[in-house]
Design a protein with these regions (language model features):
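Membrane-helix interface/capping residues of multi-pass secondary transporters
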Residues: 29, 38-41, 153, 182, ...
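Short runs within selected transmembrane alpha-helices of multi-pass transporters and secretion channels
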Residues: 62, 129-148, 156-167, 185-200, ...
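Hydrophobic transmembrane alpha-helices of multi-pass small-molecule transporters
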Residues: 53-56, 167-171, 197-201, 271-275, ...
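Alpha-helical transmembrane segments of multipass membrane proteins
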Residues: 26-30, 100, 142-146, 168-173, ...
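Helix-loop interface residues and adjacent transmembrane-helix termini in multi-pass membrane transporters
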Residues: 26, 35-38, 72, 149-150, ...
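Small-residue-rich hydrophobic transmembrane alpha-helices
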Residues: 41-100, 137-156, 262-326, 359-378
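Transmembrane helix-bundle signature of multi-pass secondary active exporters and lipid flippases
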Residues: 14-63, 67, 133-137, 224-290, ...
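Short alpha-helical transmembrane segments in multi-pass integral membrane proteins
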Residues: 1-15, 69-133, 177-231, 288-355, ...
C-alpha cells in the first residue's frame, strides 16, 4: 500500500474514533441541557477543563510512549517493549490525586473552577463520579495509542466508537428512565472508556501484536523519554482546558452565567472541531514516526504536506457548515429558549471558529514535530497556542472589545502561533 493510501486510511479511521469521543461530551451537554437548563450547561463547561487535564495527561503518556515505541521498533530496538507497561503504571500514579479529590472534596474543586453555590450544589455528584474513573480515561488513551501504532487503527476506531455509542445511549437511560439525573450522565461517561479498553485489548491476543506487558516498576527515566515526545499532546489538550477556564472567568465578569452557558455551546462544538484535527495529527503520527525511524525524510515531509492540506480543507468545510446553520446549531443546547444566550452563542460561534483555519495547521504541525523527535519545537508550538498567545490575546482583546474580543482571542492567537510554527518548520527543513 502506498504511503498516501496508508495516510488516508489511518487519518480517516482516527478522525472517526476521536469524533466519537467528542460526541459523547456533546451527548452529555444535550441531555444535561434538557434536564437542568442553562445551569447544567454552565456546570459542564466548568467541568470541561478538568476533563481536559485528565485527557492531557493520558495524551502525554499515551502518545509520547507510543511514539517512542514506534521509532524504536522501526529501528529494531528491543527497548520498545518497556514503554507500554511503564505508561500504564504512571497513569495509575497520576490518576490518584483526581480520585482522592473525587472522594473527599469535589465541591472545593468546583468552587476553584469558578462555580457559585447553585452550580456547586448541582454538580457535586457529577464531579465525584467522573473523577473516580480517572484511571480508565487515562489508560484508554494509552491503550488506543499503542494499538494504533502497532498497525491496527481499525480496532482503535471501533473501540472508541463503541464506547461513545454506549455513552450516548446510557446517558439517556441513566438520566431519564432510571431517574439518576446528572450523576447518571457522569456514570455513562465514566463507563465508556472501560468498554473501549476491553475492545482494544483484543489486539494483544493476536499473533501480529508486538506490544507486550512487561513486569516492571514505574521508571522515571522511561517516563521522561515518553513525556519528551508527548508534551505537545499534553499542551494541546490542556489548551482547551486553559482557554475554557480563562474565557469562563472573563465572561462571568462581563455578562454572568448566561455568557458562560453560551460559551458552553461554543466550547462543546469546538471539542468536535479539535477532535477532527487531532484525528489528522494522531492518524499521521505512526506513519511519520516510522518514516523517521527508517531515515525516510522525504516520506515524513510528504505526510506533513498531506496533513496540512487536509487540515485546511476540513477547516473550510467545517466553517461553511457552521456559517450556514449557526442558528439551528446553537438551538440544540438552548432548551430554555433563552434569547440572550442564543445571541451570545451565535456571534461567538462565527468569530471563534475562524481560528480553525490556523489551528488545524498548528495541531498537525505540532504532531509532526513530536513524531520526528523534535520535542522542543513541538512544545513551543503547543505552548504558544495553548498558553502564551491565547491568554495574552484574551486579556487584551476582551479589554478592548468586550465579549467579541473574548471570541476573537482564539483566531488571533492561532494566527500568531501559525507564524511561529512556519518559522520552526523552515528552520530545519
Amino acid at each position: 500500500m502506498s504511503l498516501t493510501k496508508q495516510y488516508f486510511k489511518y487519518v480517516s479511521q482516527n478522525i472517526f474514533g476521536l469524533l466519537g469521543t467528542s460526541c459523547y461530551i456533546l451527548a452529555d451537554t444535550y441531555f444535561i441541557s434538557q434536564a437542568s437548563g442553562t445551569s447544567g450547561v454552565a456546570l459542564l463547561n466548568l467541568c470541561l477543563p478538568i476533563y481536559n487535564f485528565i485527557f492531557a495527561i493520558g495524551s502525554m503518556l499515551g502518545l509520547g510512549a507510543a511514539t517512542r515505541y514506534a521509532i524504536l521498533r522501526a529501528q529494531g530496538d528491543e527497548r520498545s517493549e518497556r514503554y507500554f507497561s511503564n505508561a500504564l503504571l504512571w497513569a495509575l500514579v497520576f490518576a490518584l490525586p483526581f480520585m482522592l479529590a473525587g472522594i473527599f472534596c469535589p465541591e472545593v474543586l468546583l468552587r476553584f473552577m469558578g462555580g457559585d453555590a447553585e452550580i456547586v450544589t448541582l454538580g457535586v455528584g457529577y464531579a465525584r463520579i467522573f473523577l473516580l474513573f480517572t484511571p480508565f480515561f487515562m489508560c484508554n488513551y494509552i491503550v488506543s495509542a499503542f494499538v494504533r501504532n502497532d498497525g491496527d487503527p481499525s480496532l482503535a476506531m471501533v473501540a472508541t466508537l463503541c464506547g461513545s455509542l454506549f455513552n450516548v445511549v446510557f446517558d439517556y437511560i441513566f438520566m431519564f428512565p432510571m431517574g439518576l439525573g446528572l450523576p447518571g450522565a457522569a456514570l455513562a461517561t465514566a463507563v465508556s472508556p472501560v468498554l473501549s479498553i476491553a475492545i482494544c485489548s483484543r489486539h494483544f491476543f493476536k499473533k501480529s501484536s508486538t506490544v507486550r506487558l512487561v513486569r516492571q516498576l514505574p521508571s522515571p527515566k522511561l517516563l521522561a523519554q515518553s513525556c519528551q515526545l508527548g508534551v505537545s499532546g499534553f499542551v494541546g489538550e490542556m489548551s482547551s482546558g486553559l482557554t475554557t477556564t480563562v474565557f469562563n472567568l472573563l465572561l462571568l465578569r462581563l455578562a454572568g452565567n448566561v455568557a458562560v452557558a453560551a460559551y458552553g455551546v461554543v466550547a462543546n462544538y469546538a471539542l468536535v472541531a479539535t477532535a477532527i484535527f487531532n484525528g489528522v495529527a494522531q492518524g499521521a503520527q505512526p506513519l511519520v514516526s516510522r518514516c523517521y525511524g527508517k531515515n525516510d525524510a522525504a516520506g515524513a515531509r510528504k505526510l506533513l504536506l498531506l496533513g496540512s492540506g487536509t487540515a485546511l480543507a476540513l477547516a473550510a468545510a467545517l466553517y461553511a457548515v457552521l456559517f450556514g446553520f449557526t442558528g439551528p446549531i446553537v438551538a440544540v443546547f438552548n432548551s430554555e429558549n433563552s434569547a440572550l444566550m442564543a445571541q451570545y452563542a451565535f456571534s461567538g460561534m462565527r468569530i471563534y471558529f475562524l481560528g480553525y483555519f490556523f489551528a488545524g495547521f498548528n495541531i498537525v504541525a505540532a504532531g509532526y514535530l513530536g513524531a520526528v523527535d523534535r520535542p522542543a519545537e513541538a512544545s513551543a508550538t503547543s505552548l504558544s497556542r495553548g498558553i502564551v498567545a491565547i491568554v495574552a490575546c484574551s486579556l487584551v482583546l476582551s479589554a478592548l472589545f468586550g465579549m467579541n474580543g473574548v471570541w476573537a482571542a482564539f483566531p488571533a492567537s492561532e494566527a500568531i502561533t501559525a507564524c511561529l510554527t512556519i518559522f520552526l518548520l523552515k528552520r530545519k527543513n
